Amino acid sequence: MSTSTSEPGAIAGLPLGAEVRTDGDATGLSVAIVGGGIVGIALALGLVERGVRVSVYERAQELPEIGVGFAFNGAARKSMARLSPLVMAAVERVANENEQAYDNYWDGYTSTAEDDESSTASKRGKLLFRMPNSNMAWWSCLRSQFLNEMLQALPPGTVTFGKELDSYDDPFDTSDPVRLRFTDGTTAAANVLIGSDGLRSRVRQQLFATSHPEVCNPTYTHKTCYRAVIPMAAAESAMGLSKPHNHCMHTGPRAHVLSYPIAQHKLVNVVLFVTHDEPWVDGTGDEAISVPRMTRPGDKKVLQNRLADWRPEVRNLVAQLPDAPTAWGIFDTAEHPVPFYAAGRVGLVGDAAHASSPHHGAGAGFGVEDALALAVALGMATEKKQSVAAALQAFNDVRYDRTQWLIRSSKETGDIYEWKHFGVGGDPVKIRAELEGRQKTIWDYDVDAMAEEVKTRYEARVTSETTAHQ
């Protein structure tokens, strides 16, 4: 919360544009967040910062210890800083910056007669191009570490684990609150329900079950990924001394490999993507079930055979995978996008609203932008249902177009990395031009202007509602 002390009437210690409440330490508004992932917990901290009462319900029994790495760009960090100093402090404690001022894009497929498994040149391979990353300004970290830091910053009792949402009621035409029912038979109530429950959001499923059933569940993109977090020494052995310390993308036909350092350059996050023509069959072996699991057992030998013709450094990375790596199906909502992110007193954020493939590496960052926009809107609202609805609609108005663009562009970017995007193919010049334009849309975003637009739209809706009832 903040405003510059150089401005007339500024509050000491608060930056320009901060949302400052004048009606006490806490509002009468209560918010229930379903889903305790990165976006849900960041939103909770942002609401607490604005004096809003919040409860988070997470289906997992405890904090997951999945060693998945991911990265945040500069726009996401600006959103964190404005959400709450506690969010920014959390990421600063666990993240590391890219060592060099550019990202590297490599031909991971084409071998040459000079290639030798043990040579430095072989591990380096053919550089297609470098792109300056000062604008993207990546910070990388382990998901579990960042989440744990944010959880510790929340007031005790804010998060309840082991709570899986079964259903909810939003009696908008009455004065009753939104009521949540959990699978263990317990209930809860709040003025607002926010679904931050990810790809297979239970809140999304109920919100659109009758009106738009086709959007209730995401669709398989025919890409599967395999993840590994490996020691830096192993990565240096596989790729040489330089590559592991920077964002690297190895491109090629029907597959691509992303790697970048995490944990203060002690570890390297490796993500291998492979395109498959066949439908997704999950670990149950049943492709007909309506909501398949997103993971299934993998086989390193199958992957090694699939990439046997790729360059040595890529094969070396694949060798670092466990013998039975988990295969993660890549699902998104590109085929059936949700028509809106809020109705009544129920809203969706992050993957629950706009599940995207990970090829831009921006899904979590866009979710944090969502969290800021929603925290600003709800931080201005009262417990009155018209005020809540106005806040949620202001959030929807500001966030919908940008986040829907991400879904489409990320899917296309996955094809660009695999040399099959129409009109681009494997041409490095065209690949670079495509990526530069898309990345500019991601980083060239004014989060302060976004927050101000949320305020303006909220106030306009409240004024319109008030006028209509006079």
UniProtKB/Swiss-Prot annotation:
Keywords: FAD, Flavoprotein, Membrane, Monooxygenase, Oxidoreductase, Transmembrane, Transmembrane helix
Pathways involved: Mycotoxin biosynthesis
Topology within the bilayer: Single-pass membrane protein
GO MF term set: FAD binding; monooxygenase activity
One GO biological process term: secondary metabolite biosynthetic process
Main location: membrane
UniProt cross-references to InterPro entries, sorted A to Z: FAD-bd (IPR002938), FAD/NAD-bd_sf (IPR036188), FAD_monoxygenase (IPR051104)
Any one cellular-component term (Gene Ontology): membrane
Regions crossing the membrane: 28-48
The UniProt record lists the keyword Membrane: yes
Needed cofactors: FAD
Localization per record: Membrane
Active site: R227, Y260
Pfam families hit by this protein: FAD_binding_3
EC numbers on record: 1.-.-.-
Entry binding sites for FAD: E58, A71, R143, D351, A364
Family listed: Belongs to the paxM FAD-dependent monooxygenase family.
Purpose of the protein: FAD-dependent monooxygenase; part of the satratoxin SC1 cluster involved in the biosynthesis of satratoxins, trichothecene mycotoxins that are associated with human food poisonings. Satratoxins are suggested to be made by products of multiple gene clusters (SC1, SC2 and SC3) that encode 21 proteins in all, including polyketide synthases, acetyltransferases, and other enzymes expected to modify the trichothecene skeleton. SC1 encodes 10 proteins, SAT1 to SAT10.
Note: Trichothecenes are sesquiterpenoid toxins that act by inhibiting protein biosynthesis.
Record's protein name: FAD-dependent monooxygenase SAT7
Source lineage: Eukaryota, Fungi, Dikarya, Ascomycota, Pezizomycotina
